[in-house]
Curated annotation (Swiss-Prot):
Disulfide bonds: none
Pfam family for this entry, one: Ribosomal_L1
Species of the source: Campylobacter jejuni subsp. jejuni serotype O:2 (strain ATCC 700819 / NCTC 11168)
Any GO BP annotation: translation
Protein name: Large ribosomal subunit protein uL1
Keywords noted in UniProt: Repressor, Ribonucleoprotein, Ribosomal protein, RNA-binding, rRNA-binding, Translation regulation, tRNA-binding
Record flagged with keyword rRNA-binding: yes
Amino acid sequence: MAKIAKRLKELSQKIDSNKEYALSDAIDTIKTLKSAKFDETVEIALKLNVDPRHADQMVRGSVVLPAGTGKKVRVAVIAKDAKADEAKNAGADIVGSDDLVEEIQKGNMNFDVLIATPNLMGLVGKVGRILGPKGLMPNPKTGTVTMDVAQAVNNAKSGQVNFRVDKQGNIHAGLGKVSFSKEQLWDNVSTFVKAINKHKPAAAKGRYIKNAALSLTMSPSVKLETQELLDMK
C-alpha cells in the first residue's frame, strides 16, 4: 500500500488539481501517467445532473466506440434455429438456448456480453437474478434483446460500451487503452460523450454534465472542461 500511495503522489504532481483540462490536453496528460506493467484502461467518470430515482431521469444506452475498447469480448447468444446459426456465423463465442440457461444456473458464465432474441426472454428470465447483479441481463435499450443477432454480435465485438447512471448520478466507462493513439482516444471519448448528451432526459434541469474526469486504471484523475463536453453533439 505504501508503494501505491507513493506512486500516486508522484503521479499527482504531474496534474494541476485546480484546473479543468481541455480534452486534447487531458489525453496528453494521462498518457504521461502510465505506471503499471500492463496496458492500462483509459476511464471516464461523469457526474450528471439527474435524479435516477425518477424513471424519466434515467440515462441508459449503448454506443460502439470507433477505435474499440482494446479488450477481447466473449459474446454469448440465446437463440434457436436460424437465429442461432446467424449468431454463430457472426462470430459469437457461445450459442445456445435451454442448455445455455442451464449452464448459467450452474454459475458457468464464461462471457462478457449476453444477447437474446425477444421470443426467448421468458427463458432468460429464469436466470435474471443471476445475470442482473452482474450487469449481464439482455436489454432492448442496449441492443442486446434483438432479432438482428448478427448486428448485435458485431457491435459487441467491435467495442460496444453499455452505460447506465447509478443512484448518485454517476456514469463510469472504459474507453480504450493507454497504448491507443491520441486520435483514437479522442474519437472514443467524444463518441461516448455525444451518446451521453443524446440520452439527456427531457426532465433533466440545469447543467447536465456537472463534473467529468479521465484517468488510467492505476492513476489519479484529470478533470475535464465540462462545457467542451456539453458542446459535443
